[in-house]
Structure formats: C-alpha cells, structure tokens
C-alpha cells in the first residue's frame, strides 16, 4: 500500500521465478499446480489501484538464458494505466504558466489553485506501453558486466486533461535505451558484499532537427485560442535524451552469515533535449516520498524516493536529480522461505527544474529506520519511518515525520 492525493493506493503482484514458456501448453511436463516450471524464466503480473481515480496493470516476461546456450537475456513487457481528473494543487492554469515559463526561461508564478472538481470520469490520461529488450553478458572488463538494448513505445491519450500543457490528443514516445551494468553482489535480498553499477542512455529520434517546424513560436502562449491545436502538433512525437547513473556498494561488518551490512548509494539522472523550445513534458523526475512507481500526483514521470519528505514534494516535474544514502542493515531472519532485516539510514537528495542548476552537494537531508521482509510469491515489503530535516519549502510543508510503505526491490 501507498498514499496518494486521493487516498490509499493498493498494489498486488505475482512473480513466478522458475517459469517455463515452453511448458506452458505442454501436457505431462513439469508444473507446480497449473504453473509451468523448469526453465528459470520470470513471469510477473501486477496491478495498482485506489479505486475510482487510478488503475494500472502490467505483464512482463524475462528469459535470462535466451537461446538456451549462452547467458543472453530477452525481455518483453506490456502495461496500461488510467488516471482520472482530481483536484490537485499541482495542476492548475497557474501551473501551466509556471511550467511553460520554466521551459523557456520566462520567469515563474504560483502553482497552487483549488478551482477544479475533485473527480470527473470524463477527464483522464491513459498510457499504453510495450517494450522488447535483448541483453548479453560481456567478457571484458570481466564477466560480471552486461549490456542491454531495449526498444520502448508509449502512447499517451488525454481527454479534457486540464492539468497539463496538453488537454486533448495523443502523444507518442519511441525510444531506444542502452544500458551497461555490473553486479558482483552475493545475493539479491540481503547482500553481504559486492556492488551494483548501472549507466544508461535513452534517446528518441531528434525529430526537431529535420521536421522544419518553428518550435520557438509554436504553442508558446497558453491563453492563445490556437494553443491546444499547436500543442498537439508540437508534442505528437516527443523527443529527449535521458542519462542515468546508479551505484550501490555493500560491506559486511563481520564474518558471520548473519552480520550487519553497510550499504552506500549514489545516483543521478538528467533529462536533456535536442531543442530548447521542445523540451519533453514527459519522462521528468517525480522526487520525494516512498518512491513507489506508478500512481503519483503526476504521470508519465520517473518516480524517485527520498524518505522523510512528501511524495513529489522535492520536484514533480524535475529535469535532473541526485540522491545519496548511507544505510546500516541488521538481519533478523535469513531463511529460504522468509527473510527479514532491520535498517537505519541517512539520506540526502534533491531535484532541479533546470539542468544548469544540478548540484549533488545541494541536498535535502533525512534520517530514519525501518524493516524489510521478503515473502515467497509476494516479494519485498517494507515500512520506514523517516524525518526530513527541511520541513518547509517556502510556506509549503514538505518534510518532518513521515511513514513510508515499500513494495518491490529497488536499485
């Protein structure tokens, strides 16, 4: 469970770790009940909802030994989500002006307003996504490195969505991502030693370099009678380049299997553009809170947790972010069926609406403690209490004492 502006958000998921697509339709082959098993593939099904306002469903498949001979990885995923209109402080006509002024350096204005109905089923944004990926283990610099290429397509469908730059129409996002990663940890749930490293670049085609449109003078005035038509044309195919770096290191503070472990983490992300007048309104960073992906006060954003702060309070449409964590873990139970550990942490991070303001040393800090539990067929669950030391941003309360619920493994 998590918490959004419209109440409790529930999530349910199933994960089959020894799935066999080959045995799915075979008779008399290896099964666990009705589940075909034996090939080490992973099938995941999940859903999130808070009832009326938000629903999301996803299905993913992973084959770590694609072809059966070499450790080549094949992945496929499909997802659908729908968010209906809510009364949100972050989406008002003042917000359009503030956000649009940010895009082109024209100043800023207040983003707070309460003028919309709390719920309207005729206002919505829908997202449909599909992706295919292929990865390969590398032999250099060592065999712990892997490289993955993934093709992704997302279609955004908006109707009467008066909380955004575009209220009606369809937007398309086709991108190719390249990911270099290395993992030397001894296990997934409670690593004692080793590190995880990831560097990725995702890029769309640079449509604005050849389509001949004058983006400087296209959809640059929200109050214009032709704004929505121009915005649909401007963002029919969105463009960007997105850079990610993530690193975690684990150090055992003892020689026994059940010993404390110190985890350190540093990560950052940057969302760039090819044309300063066509910055992507999608794929931005939603920073603060528990970091649960999916339902946020925004949509089509990458959710970054920062414990001790309200969800999205650091940034709801940031173009760069950084985060650092120092976390001490202590095992309470490490069994095959169920594992539990307690933790205490110091954390800091921030997000910026301009890449030029990016500064990893400019941090909003927090501290706290929590617990994690790993359950079969369910995965990772957790709860944290944290205190954000920067309680206010201007007059808005963003930090202080916070409880956060965690679902799913995070890197």
Locate the predicted segments by residue:
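C-terminal outer-membrane beta-barrel translocator/porin domains of Gram-negative envelope proteins
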Residues: 1-6, 15, 159-332, 337, ...
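Gram-negative/organellar outer-membrane beta-barrel architecture
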Residues: 1-190, 196, 386-411
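Short, glycine/acidic-rich beta->alpha junctions
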Residues: 53, 126, 172, 239, ...
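Small/polar glycine-rich anion-binding or flexible loop at a beta-alpha turn
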Residues: 342-347, 362, 366
